[in-house]
C-alpha cells in the first residue's frame, strides 16, 4: 500500500523540498491518523503563491493612501488655522462706508434738493454694493438722467452690478466695472464727480459739521459774483447810451463841421430822432453845461444846428453824409482784402495785401516785387526761401518770415 501511495504522490504536484524532506513527508504519511493535522500545515503554507502575497503588499498602500490623504488637511488645519481663516474671512471683512457731503456744490447736472434728500452715508457694505448705490443716487438726482447715464463707464465680467436710468420712454441698464478694492471705488466716484462738476460729493471719511458754514460763505460769495456779473452785463448793455450822452460835449463842437461829425454822436442823434420829448430844448442842455446855454436860451448858434425835434430830416441826411465821409478808408481796406479765404484763388493784389498785412515792417517794403513778378495765390504757395532770396532779392530774415507765414497759410483750414 505504501508503494502505491508514493507513485501516486509523484503524479501530483511536485514538491518544493529536497529529498530528505521527501523522506520526512513519507514518514509522516506512514504515521498514525492522529498526526494528520500536522501534515496539513505545510500544505497550506505551500499552496499560498508568492505573487498573491506581493499583490496584497502592493494593494495595501493603495488602499491606505486615500485615508492618509484625507486626514492631512485635518492635521494641517491646526497650525494653518490662523493663516487660512483670515484669507477666507478677508472678502467678508472688506466693507466700505461712503459719506455724502450734502453741503457740496451740486453742479449743473445734479438737483440740489434731491441731493439733500440722500442718506448720510452708504454702507458699510461690500464695495460693489456701495458703488452701485452711489452711482444710482447720482442718476436719480440728475436733472436729465440721460446725461449722467452716458458718463457712467461700462463694465464687463466679474460680479455684475448694474444701474438703471429712464429716458426716451425706456428703462436702460448698464453694468458697472468689477470692484477690486476700496481705492477703486473712490477713484471711480472721483472721476464721475469731476465730470459732473460736483467735487467733494463723496468721501470715505465723515464730513465735519463746520463745513456748512463755509459752504454758506461760498454761496454768499457766489451770489455776490453773480450780482457783479449781472451788473457788468447791464453796464455793458447800457454803457453805449451813457457814453453817447457824455460824448455830446466833444461832439457839440463838431456840429459846426458836418463833415467831421464824431461817430458816437450819430447814435445820440438817433436817440433824439426816436422821440425823446424831454430833450426838445436842446440835447446838450442836460449834459453840456454852459456850452449849451446859448442854444437853450435862443442865442446865436452855429449854422446848420437845429433842434432834433424841429428838423429830423436834416439830422438824418447829415448823419448819412458823415458816415459816407468817415467810411471810405474802411471800405477801401475791406475792398483790398481777398474775397476768398482759399489762397489758391487769390489774385496778385490779394497776395500783395497778404504780404503787407503779415509783417508790415519786414515785408512791407517788398510788396512791389510781388506785383512786378505777378505772383498770385498759387505761386505764393509754391515759394520757398531759396527762391525768394534768389529771384526776389530778399535777405534771409525777411525770406524766412515770409516762408513762415506761407506755412501757416497752408496749415489753415479754408
Curated annotation (Swiss-Prot):
Give the stretches traversing the membrane: none
Q: Name one GO cellular component term.
A: nucleus
Q: What is an example of a GO molecular function annotated in this UniProt entry?
A: chromatin binding
Domain (SAM): residue spans on this chain: 288-354
Q: Which InterPro entries match?
A: PcG_chromatin_remod_factors, SAM, SAM/pointed_sf, SAM_Scm-like, SCML2_RBR, SLED, SLED_sf
Keywords, A to Z, come to: Nucleus, Phosphoprotein, Repressor, Transcription, Transcription regulation
State its location(s).
Answer: Nucleus
Task: Give the Phosphoserine positions (modified residues).
Answer: 55, 65
UniProt lists compositionally biased (Polar residues) regions at: 257-276, 312-332
Positions of the region Disordered? 257-343
Predominant localisation class: nucleus
Gene Ontology terms describing biological process: negative regulation of DNA-templated transcription
Listed Low complexity bias regions: 284-304
What family is this protein classified in? Belongs to the SCM family.
Per the entry, what this protein does is: Putative Polycomb group (PcG) protein. PcG proteins act by forming multiprotein complexes, which are required to maintain the transcriptionally repressive state of homeotic genes throughout development.
**Official protein name in the record:** Sex comb on midleg-like protein 4
Provide the taxonomic classification.
Eukaryota, Metazoa, Chordata, Craniata, Vertebrata
Underlying gene: SCML4
